């Protein structure tokens, strides 16, 4: 039998509990429809509150604030409860149809009871959420690291550069600053120190952002790094498009005073595409970037740019000694002296100073240091650390060159000696001779100078002045390394330039050589006959060659470029030069060649022949046989002047460029009246004209003329002709007769009264007048005004020496927008310069003269005096304008 359990409970309590249960359970069923309506209304209210809250959150996040965790938690709860409510609402029609007895009962009492209970609980949850969703503050500023400091090398000797860059950046008008310079020069180090200095500036800037851009520009990667730095990341960022990311970044940064540091730019970074607001004086934001390409500064619209240069010798030595260490330097008394030579090989490049200094830090015998010099001189690429740490970094600039043409032209620069000033004209002539660039008239030179500009702006060449460039020694080693197929085929590119060698390389080395440079050595004689089946280039300029074996040229069938210039003892060439059947470029400039080699006329492919400064040449008869010749340079050449020479020149149908010196009046007249020869003349020197040749008339077709020189001639007037009609200066004209004439010099032309014809040379940059005793004025104001032409708009240098009768350069002030230098010496009658306060906008004008002349100089007014007096530079009375002492 089962047991019996007895429970004691009062009747009243039982009745109360049963009634409560019935009432509550009754509400689950009887109030179901009303409860469902209340649930839907509560859901709508909470969703509206969520949308309002999200709009407010988005607005705050655009200002760079970050949503509060409690707010994000509430939004997440709402997003979780919405589908649960919708599920209950979808069951409404089924559950309502089950109700009966006016909603007091259900056909399925258990199901309706459970459903009604879920509805009531959901109402309670929604109401609680609605109550919790009342936020006065939804986001707050997160004090992320305003500046993330970067590890940096010590600023050895670069402090002045840092101060200069920092001070320039802090100027109100500077928003974008570009730092450009060659690879390894310390641009990233400098930018890192700028970054770290912002941590000590206080709260002037809201945020400093560092981005490494690198060669492959990726806008979205830059955007991602900026957004991460802003600490406003969310899970949806990666799915956004580039345009939306840009908009988000812009809406945050426009409320901030930011600094953006972009390291290693190789192409324009479009700030609009990234979403970065442009810095302005009003928003106070700053952008600084580093690049190896100067042209990027222009593409980025910088307010200022700054070249990061190699260290000065003393500063370079300081850095090098810190890397080597005092113990090593003190381990042998000769090491410091030898170490200076090693350091000098680095030419102030911090990358090389660091790597080579570290390599030598534990080499404590003088023999090891001398060996280092030998390796760095003969084959620097083999030096420890060079191929692994130095040359690959520099090679990025080479790899960035857009064409094979640019790369070939760059490699060619390595044929010159270390630290050599390379004449731009020489480079262009070589490149034309090699066939690297277009050989058409006009195009070739322009293209050559464009290539030089690209290499300079790429920091692969350094521009010394308007005429010359230089290649940094370490960059040169990189070029040689590349040219030798990264050291695998060194014999292809034999460069022993400037080493004071007395002999040519061993015979065996010539067999595979393609380019050989032996310029600037002490070679006196060539007696060997190396077999050179692949040789294309042979540069022997500036040696002491007096003899070349007749067999030397026999085995050079591919030779294209041969430079024998500046060999002062070279008096003849072997006729066997005719066997160089591929030769296109030949320079005999500044040699003592006397006899025209008969074999030269066999060089049917010769395009370029340079005989400038060959005063001893006896004849050039037969030159018309060089039918392919395009460039002929005879400037200051001593060939006899006779009509047959002009006839031969006229037979050169392909001639495009001519430089020449003439002295016979009859030949000069024929030459100037020959339209074809005159039109291709690039430089003309007129010398030793006799007193009967008192007037020189130029034809108005010399539009190629760039240089015009007069010397030791008794001419008293220079005229301009249009065809056969002399053009009087009093007849106005707008014609430009010398559009490319940039240099004019006159020496010992004692009868000239004025040079007013120069008004027809609008692009004149240099004018030198020396010992013109009768010259009274340079430009006659009345004659010039009749032509309505303003002279000297491009003039950069004016040099007047020993012009005793000169009273005026021009009566009245002239504008000189480009003027950089005036030198006056021995012009006692000249008391006033054609200057007023506004004549020269440039701030770097220098006026050089003797102190006594400066003391008597008259000025247009006090303002002019105040403007130009500080530019005057006096040289002592016993020193001439060239710096030589005058003996009395």
Swiss-Prot record:
Q: Where is the NB-ARC domain positioned along the sequence?
A: 139-442
Q: Where is the signal peptide?
A: none
Q: Where are the LRR repeats?
A: 512-533, 534-555, 558-580, 582-604, 605-627
Entry keyword annotation includes ATP-binding? yes
Q: Which residues form a coiled coil?
A: 22-66
Establish whether keyword Cytoplasm is in the entry: no
For the ligand (ATP), the binding residues are 181-188
- One GO-annotated biological process of the protein: defense response
* Family that this chain belongs to: Belongs to the disease resistance NB-LRR family.
Entry note about domains: The LRR repeats probably act as specificity determinant of pathogen recognition.
Protein's UniProt name: Probable disease resistance protein At5g63020
């Amino acid at each position: 039998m089962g047991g019996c359990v007895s429970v004691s409970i009062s009747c009243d309590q039982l009745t109360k509990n049963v009634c409560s249960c019935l009432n509550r359970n009754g509400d689950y069923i009887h109030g179901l429809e009303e409860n469902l309506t209340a649930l839907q209304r509560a859901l709508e209210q909470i969703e509206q509150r969520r949308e309002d809250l999200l709009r407010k959150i988005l607005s705050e996040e655009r200002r760079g604030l970050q949503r509060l965790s409690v707010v994000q938690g509430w939004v997440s709860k709402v997003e979780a409860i919405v589908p649960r409510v919708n599920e209950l609402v979808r069951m409404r029609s089924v559950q309502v149809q089950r109700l009966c007895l006016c909603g007091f009962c259900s056909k399925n009492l258990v199901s309706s009871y459970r459903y009604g209970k879920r509805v009531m609980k959901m109402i309670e949850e929604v109401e609680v959420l609605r109550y919790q969703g009342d936020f006065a503050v939804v986001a707050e500023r997160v004090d992320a690291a305003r500046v993330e400091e970067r590890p940096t090398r010590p600023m050895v000797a670069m402090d002045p550069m840092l101060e200069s860059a920092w001070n320039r950046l802090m100027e109100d008008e500077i928003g974008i600053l570009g730092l450009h310079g060659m690879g390894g020069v310390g641009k990233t180090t400098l930018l890192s120190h700028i970054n770290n200095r912002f941590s000590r500036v206080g709260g002037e800037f809201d945020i400093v952002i560092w981005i490494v851009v690198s060669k492959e520009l990726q806008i979205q990667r830059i955007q991602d790094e900026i957004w991460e730095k802003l600490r406003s990341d969310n899970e949806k960022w990666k799915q956004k498009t580039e345009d939306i990311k840009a908009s988000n970044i812009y809406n945050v940064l426009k409320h901030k005073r930011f600094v953006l540091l972009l390291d290693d730019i190789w192409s324009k970074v479009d700030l609009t595409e990234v979403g970065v607001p442009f810095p302005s004086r009003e928003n106070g934001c700053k952008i600084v970037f580093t690049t190896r390409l100067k042209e990027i500064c222009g593409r980025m619209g910088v307010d200022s740019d700054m070249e990061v240069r190699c260290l000065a010798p003393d500063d370079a030595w300081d850095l090098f000694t810190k890397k080597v260490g005092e113990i090593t330097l003190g381990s042998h008394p000769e090491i410091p002296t030898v170490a200076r030579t090693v350091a000098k090989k680095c030419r102030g490049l911090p990358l090389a100073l660091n790597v080579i200094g570290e390599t030598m830090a534990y080499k404590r015998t003088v023999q090891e240091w001398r060996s280092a010099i030998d390796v760095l001189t003969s084959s620097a690429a083999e030096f420890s650390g060079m191929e692994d740490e130095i040359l690959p970094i520099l090679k990025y600039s080479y790899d960035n060159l857009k064409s094979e043409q640019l790369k070939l032209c760059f490699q060619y620069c390595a044929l010159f000696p270390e630290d050599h000033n390379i004449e731009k004209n020489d480079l262009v002539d070589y490149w034309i001779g090699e066939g690297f660039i277009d050989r058409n008239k006009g195009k070739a030179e322009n293209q050559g100078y464009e290539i030089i500009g690209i290499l300079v702006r790429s920091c692969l060449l350094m521009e010394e002045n308007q005429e010359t460039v230089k290649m940094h020694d370490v960059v040169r080693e990189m070029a040689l390394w590349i040219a030798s197929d990264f050291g695998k085929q060194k014999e292809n590119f034999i460069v022993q330039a400037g080493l004071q060698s007395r002999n040519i390389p061993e015979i065996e080395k010539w067999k595979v050589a393609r380019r050989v440079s032996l310029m600037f050595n002490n070679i006196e004689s060539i007696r060997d006959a190396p077999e050179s089946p692949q040789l294309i280039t042979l540069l022997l300029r500036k040696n002491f060659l007096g003899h070349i074996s007749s067999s030397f040229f026999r085995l050079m069938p591919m030779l294209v470029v041969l430079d024998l210039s500046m060999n002062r003892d070279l008096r003849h060439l072997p006729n066997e030069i005719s066997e160089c059947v591929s030769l296109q470029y030949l320079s005999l400039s500044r040699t003592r060649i006397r006899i025209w080699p008969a074999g030269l006329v066999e060089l049917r492919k010769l395009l370029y022949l340079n005989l400038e400064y060959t005063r001893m040449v006896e004849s050039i008869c037969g030159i018309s046989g060089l039918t392919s010749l395009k460039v002929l340079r005879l400037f200051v050449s001593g060939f006899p002047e006779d009509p047959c020479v002009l006839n031969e020149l006229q037979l050169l149908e392909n001639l495009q460029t001519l430089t020449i010196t003439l002295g016979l009046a009859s030949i000069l007249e024929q030459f100037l009246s020959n339209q074809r020869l005159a039109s291709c003349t690039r430089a003309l020197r007129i010398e030793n004209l006799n007193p009967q040749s008192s007037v020189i008339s130029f034809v108005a077709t010399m539009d190629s003329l760039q240089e015009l020189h007069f010397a030791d001639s008794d001419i008293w007037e220079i005229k301009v002709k249009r065809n056969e009609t002399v053009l009087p200066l009093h007849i106005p004209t707008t014609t430009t007769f010398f559009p490319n004439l940039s240099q004019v010099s006159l020496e010992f032309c004692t009868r000239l009264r004025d040079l007013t014809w120069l008004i027809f040379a609008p692009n004149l940059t240099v004018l030198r007048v020396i010992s013109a005793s009768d010259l009274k004025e340079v430009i006659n104001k009345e004659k010039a005004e009749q032509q309505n032409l303003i002279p000297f708009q491009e003039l950069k240098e004016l040099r007047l020496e020993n012009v005793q009768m000169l009273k005026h350069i021009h009566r009245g002030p002239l504008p000189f927008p480009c003027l950089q230098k005036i030198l006056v010496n021995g012009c006692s009658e000249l008391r006033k310069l054609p200057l007023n306060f506004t004549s020269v906008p440039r701030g770097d004008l220098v006026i050089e003269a003797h102190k006594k002349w400066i003391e008597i100089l008259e000025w247009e007014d006090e303002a002019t005096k105040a403007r130009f007096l500080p530019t005057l530079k006096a040289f002592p009375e016993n020193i001439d304008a060239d710096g030589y002492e005058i003996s009395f």
